Amino acid sequence: MAKVIGIDLGTTNSCLAISENGQTKVIENAEGARTTPSVIAYLDGGEILVGAPAKRQAVTNAKNTIYAAKRLIGHKFEDKEVQRDIESMPFEIIKANNGDAWVKAQGKELSPPQISAEVLRKMKEAAEAYLGEKVTEAVITVPAYFNDSQRQATKDAGRIAGLDVKRIINEPTAAALAFGMDKGDNKDRKVAVYDLGGGTFDISIIEIANLDGDKQFEVLATNGDTFLGGEDFDQRLIDHIIAEFKKEQGIDLKQDVMALQRLKEAAEKAKIELSSGQQTEINLPYITMDATGPKHLAMKITRAKFESLVEDLIARSIEPCRTALKDAGLSTSDIDDVILVGGQSRMPKVQEAVRDFFGKEPRKDVNPDEAVAVGAAIQGEVLSGGRSDVLLLDVTPLSLGIETMGGVMTKLIQKNTTIPTKASQVFSTAEDNQSAVTIHVLQGERERASANKSLGQFNLGDIAPAPRGMPQIEVTFDIDANGILHVSAKDKGTGKAANITIQGSSGLSEEEIERMVKDAEANAEEDKKLTELVASRNQAEALIHSVKKSLADYGDKLDAAEKEKIEAALKEAEEAVKGDDKAAIDAKTEALGAASQKLGEMVYAQAQAEAQAGESEQANASAKKDDDVVDADFEEVKDDKK
């Protein structure tokens, strides 16, 4: 059986692991290190350096040394995040013919998957050297909040590197897998995986359950930010140093590519030192020069100063934690373990923020740099058939439902529901004798149907003639383990059914998902007003329907003036319902109710008369029976007399 390796393709560093016979090992690279810097250098003559060798020569070859390519993967050049990075990157980011963000090095235009493939190729070679055999299959991890194009671009990078990517799995899930399989106990636990890496942030709430010796990893909720990570922390420090140097020397180091590369190295080193010390010194002699001669940079940075520079970045990571917990239906007290993943999670202030939010100390027995690769390797062994004691369950990221009366979306499956899943709900017709219904399938979080993503629609016909609200149409949503959605509708009266199969992930990018959720929050007030308007409209239509029916049955018993008054109120109410003025609809509904009061009294009186007539018949029948009844005495027997 071919070995399936696990690769954590990180923004700053990457890691490789293999799992055999239930034992997982992190494999060292050619330099003997357990992690590899995700840095690629393009030299004159076509030579390519990857990892530490590329990082070492970066200062003298800044324009052709690429780092953090993962931040560009699957992105368009015009994306605001890319535009923000252009200012701070020493290498050139360009717009490709298809609108994607690419990089120019040594005169060549390179795509991010092409650049990332160099790191993957180095991982592949290290695995082959360790195993002594050819490696062609891998599980590669991505941030949980990566969109479809980013995931596809990661798969493309694997293919360019000569790897068949068997599965793309989420980094927090992989870390939970590594943590859960490492625990010898059979305890069920809920874990929060806080993954603050070099370029991305994810939070996942995962339940680890023991099922007869097997372990099930169920993602309850996930959230994140694909442009928040250690690179942003470095940049805050770089910007501070540049501003201070400009104040002192009047020189802007932003214009000097070689100085920027030296600053990046110094900032990264200072950041790491400040995780263990209270102060560090940055010394960069001959950082630049002007007419007066060479300039040297010497600056002390305290931990407190650095923490103040990145305070808002740390705060930005806490809000998704709050959302993920809310989506999972849990409170912080329900979380058994907090796992920190990603190099940036080593920062004491980050750990303090996580501890304060979750109310417990994060675990220290998980290696933040290696856990993700280890989890990927475990999943690789599962896929190769080497082990069957692990089950991963994913979630659907957005709510699913159908359009119902009034143009609102009625949700059948809520976002963050574990898949596979199935849900059914009974609906009815909106008109008398309606012979068909259209089932319009939607995905999103908004109340207004038109504001959500339309996934498709189908018709259910041959509904037996009946008054509105009488037929029972059962709509069933069924999502399989592949995320494919099947929708069916069945008339419970006739047994007639219709269905449609929808590929839930097709045509819906993560940008759309995030936009929908954010739109839902921003437009909560508008949605509330729409819901209230629809409720008023439905109430008005129900009264209109009832009055029309009563008028048809008892109208001839009303005098002409009374009937005319009701018909006028009816017409006004029907006109109001066509508009979007809730107050007008409510007013006309009230007026119709008042105008039709006499008609209502007649309907009530008729119903009462019919009921009394029925009771009278029953009483007569009962009296006839009583003629044959003989009275008898009886004595109640107490328990103690028995």
Swiss-Prot record:
InterPro entries: ATPase_NBD, Chaperone_DnaK, Heat_shock_70_CS, HSP70_C_sf, HSP70_peptide-bd_sf, Hsp_70_fam. Induction: By stress conditions e.g. heat shock. Signal peptide: none annotated. Residues 608-642 are annotated as: Disordered. The modification Phosphothreonine is found at residue 200. CDD domains: ASKHA_NBD_HSP70_DnaK-like (cd10234). Residues 608-622 have a biased composition (Low complexity). GO terms for molecular function: ATP binding; ATP-dependent protein folding chaperone; unfolded protein binding. Keywords: ATP-binding, Chaperone, Nucleotide-binding, Phosphoprotein, Stress response. Pfam families: HSP70. Residues 628-642 have a biased composition (Acidic residues). NCBIfam families: PRK00290.1, PRK05183.1, prok_dnaK. Acts as a chaperone. Belongs to the heat shock protein 70 family. This is Chaperone protein DnaK. It comes from Neisseria meningitidis serogroup C / serotype 2a (strain ATCC 700532 / DSM 15464 / FAM18).
